[in-house]
Amino acid sequence: MGNIKKNGNIREASCDEELRAMRDCLFIIGGKWKLLILRYLANRQHLELNYTKILQDIGGISPKVLIKELKDLEQNQLICRKQNNDKVPKVFYSLSGYGKTVIPLTEAIVQWGLDHRSKITE
C-alpha cells in the first residue's frame, strides 16, 4: 500500500486512493510515447537534445505526435524546454528535477519488460 503525507502526518492510502493515484499517474505519463520519451531523456542527461535528434532516435513517432507529447510533458513539469540565443535559435529538451522522480518508475518498467520477454521466449 502507498502512503499519504498530509499536514506532517503519514497514513496508509485506501484502495480507492491508490486507484485514483494510479489513474492520475496514467493520465500524465500514460499512452504510447510519454514514458519512452522520459526514458530516452533520462538515459541522455549529459547531451543537448533537440527536437530533430529526439525524432530521429525514437523510432516510429510522428513529428506531430512528438510535438504534442513534448508540450504535455513540459506542461506537467516533467521536462524543461530551453532555447539558446544564437542567430538561429535552437530548442533543447531535458528532464526537469521533478521529471527525474520518474526514473525509478521507468527503470522498474524496463526491468519488468526484460524479464517478461525472457519468460515468454523460454
What are these regions (language model features)?
Residues 52-81, 88:
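Canonical helix-turn-helix DNA-binding module
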Residues 50, 82, 121-122:
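Short, hydrophobic secondary-structure boundary micro-motifs
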Residues 85-106:
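Basic, amphipathic "hinge/linker" alpha-helix immediately C-terminal to the N-terminal HTH DNA-binding motif
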Residues 16, 84-85:
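Short loop/turn motifs at secondary-structure junctions and domain boundaries
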Residues 2-8, 19, 39, 103-122:
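Amphipathic alpha-helical dimerization/coiled-coil segments
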Residues 1-29:
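N-terminal leader segment of winged-helix/HTH proteins
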Residues 1-8, 56-67, 119:
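Membrane-interacting alpha-helical segments
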Residues 20-64:
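N-terminal helix-turn-helix DNA-binding core of bacterial DNA-binding proteins
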